[in-house]
A protein has these predicted regions:
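Repetitive helical segments and hydrophobic/amphipathic motifs
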Residues: 11-12
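Bacterial N-terminal signal peptides that target proteins for export
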Residues: 1-8
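Sec/Tat signal peptide C-region and signal peptidase I cleavage site
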Residues: 5, 15-20
């Protein structure tokens, strides 16, 4: 849940990716893994069976994430270079930064690279692990 919401935030906020009413996610083999639906400033996440798994909502300083029951699980705060992520207690868990080429890199709380995201000309955004291996895509 936290991982997927982190991916969503990185896509939605940092790559300039514009979510349609419904955006689907796929694993590296092309099988659907879930979907995201927008309603104003709220994005709700569903698994591949259509069950709600979480959401995030815009705030004055960034975004908050919630589990499927509506309990806050974390937050994302805008910085000069991207966003920092925090757990529900306010402890920093990582960060997202976008370079001049539009590639978004995710770092853990120690500053180690843990993954990246790239969007192609068709609008498909692909997530890679720290070794450059494809993990998931969004379209």
């Amino acid at each position: 849940m936290k991982k997927l919401l982190s991916l969503l935030v990185s896509l939605f906020l940092l790559t300039g990716y514009c979510f349609a009413a419904t955006t689907n996610s796929y694993d590296k083999y092309g099988s659907k893994t879930g979907s995201y639906r927008t309603n104003g400033s709220t994005v709700t996440q569903y698994d591949k069976y259509g069950n709600k798994t979480g959401s995030y909502r815009q705030t004055s300083s960034g975004y908050n994430s919630y589990d499927k029951y509506g309990s806050k699980t974390g937050s994302y705060r805008k910085t000069s270079s991207g966003y920092n992520s925090y757990d529900k207690y306010g402890s920093k868990t990582g960060s997202f930064k976008t370079n001049s080429n539009g590639v978004t890199t995710k770092y853990d709380k120690y500053g180690n690279k843990v993954g990246s995201f790239k969007t192609d000309s068709s609008g498909r955004t692909t997530q890679y692990d720290k070794y450059g291996r494809k993990v998931e895509s969004y379209k």
